């Protein structure tokens, strides 16, 4: 079934933004297809998609991903009147501290990560726990293209065309017990292939961890992504499996997931543990609640530059208020930031 989320979630195929432009949180941490060939295009992709992905660098997609592309629901969810971020920006300006603190480190060091074979553990308060090879984990689900805004806590933003499937589909399949209230996610811990994990980042207790309330995780906008820009995820963008929660700040969208646990109590998360006064558990995009060191009322839409800063007003819930505000009825969003 094609998800139709009108009102605030619509966009044109020619209008997507590159994910390569992020401000650094080194202040906290440091203190302690150059043209896709026609044959490589996914099945059913027409002239609009060819033009849209003209700058995408071809990857080396695993067979399971290539097989699933033919049945992809293109533009299942879009945004309105906003440009898609250039692929090079989206893949060469990233926060992924497992590969280093600088924005270029993930692209420079990401090739060291081996994403095949890959497995995911699902455990905790579920009736059907298990360890799954990635190709088996994704097999039941049809890929959808979700064109989402991405808003970083550092006050920059982009628009990204993801390929993935609703997280809710996975959760329903593993059958949460009545005790399940939260979902906890964990990134791979592999210092041999993730140099940032063996460097001077003593402040981070690896592996990286994130969490959602169960009702947030079940919302149809929350997805597990395996691709972007019509191809598989590059390593620096969270290959081979990442979370995307578009109404929350980007650090909630955990990358390179190896474990999904359903739990009864609110899980500890990495950034909240490092600086709870700066990074809350909810991390909903909220222009009325500032970061202690900068305003969240406005954002730089990337790409931007000295003479074209491209600054705009930040929208509540990153523009998805119509869809998600009801999740937080009665919750003090200033206290629960």
UniProtKB/Swiss-Prot annotation:
GO terms for biological process: protein repair. Its cofactor is Mo-molybdopterin. Mo-molybdopterin binds at residues 94, 97-98, 152, 187, 237, 242, 253-255. InterPro entries: MsrP, OxRdtase_Mopterin-bd_dom, OxRdtase_Mopterin-bd_sf, TAT_signal. Residues 1-54 form the signal peptide. Binds 1 Mo-molybdopterin (Mo-MPT) cofactor per subunit. SUPFAM superfamilies: Oxidoreductase molybdopterin-binding domain. Keywords: Metal-binding, Molybdenum, Oxidoreductase, Periplasm, Signal. GO terms for cellular component: periplasmic space. Its EC number is 1.8.5.-. Heterodimer of a catalytic subunit (MsrP) and a heme-binding subunit (MsrQ). Belongs to the MsrP family. This is Protein-methionine-sulfoxide reductase catalytic subunit MsrP. It comes from Pseudomonas putida (strain ATCC 47054 / DSM 6125 / CFBP 8728 / NCIMB 11950 / KT2440). The lineage of its organism: Bacteria, Pseudomonadati, Pseudomonadota, Gammaproteobacteria, Pseudomonadales.
């Amino acid at each position: 079934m094609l998800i139709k989320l009108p009102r605030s979630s619509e966009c044109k195929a020619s209008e997507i933004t590159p994910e390569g432009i992020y401000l650094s949180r080194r202040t906290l941490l440091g203190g302690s297809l150059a043209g896709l060939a026609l044959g490589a295009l996914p099945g059913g992709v027409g002239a609009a998609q060819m033009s849209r992905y003209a700058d995408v660098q071809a990857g080396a997609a695993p067979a399971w991903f290539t097989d699933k592309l033919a049945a992809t629901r293109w533009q299942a969810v879009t945004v309105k009147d906003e440009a898609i971020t250039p692929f090079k920006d989206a893949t060469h300006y990233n926060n992924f501290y497992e590969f280093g603190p600088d924005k270029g480190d993930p692209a420079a060091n990401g090739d060291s990560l081996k994403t095949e074979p890959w497995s995911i553990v699902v455990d905790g308060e579920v009736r059907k726990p298990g360890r799954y090879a990635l190709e088996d984990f994704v097999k039941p689900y049809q890929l959808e293209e979700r064109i989402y805004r991405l808003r970083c806590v550092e006050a920059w933003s982009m628009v990204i065309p993801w390929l993935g499937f609703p997280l809710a589909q996975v959760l329903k399949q593993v059958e949460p017990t009545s005790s399940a209230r939260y979902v906890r996610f964990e990134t791979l811990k592999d210092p041999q292939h993730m140099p940032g994990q063996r460097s001077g980042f003593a402040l981070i207790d690896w592996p990286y961890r994130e969490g959602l309330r169960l009702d947030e995780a079940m919302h149809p906008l929350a997805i597990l992504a395996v691709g972007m820009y019509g191809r598989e995820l590059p390593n620096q963008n969270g290959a081979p499996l990442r979370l995307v929660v578009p109404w929350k700040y980007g650090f909630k969208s955990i990358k390179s997931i190896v474990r999904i646990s359903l739990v009864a109590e609110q899980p500890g998360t990495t950034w909240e543990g490092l600086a709870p006064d700066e990074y809350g558990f909810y991390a909903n995009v909220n222009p009325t609640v500032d970061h202690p060191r900068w305003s969240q009322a406005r954002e730089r839409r990337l790409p931007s530059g000295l003479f074209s800063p491209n600054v705009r007003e930040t929208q509540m819930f990153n523009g998805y208020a119509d869809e998600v505000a009801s999740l937080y009825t009665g919750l003090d969003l200033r206290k629960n930031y």
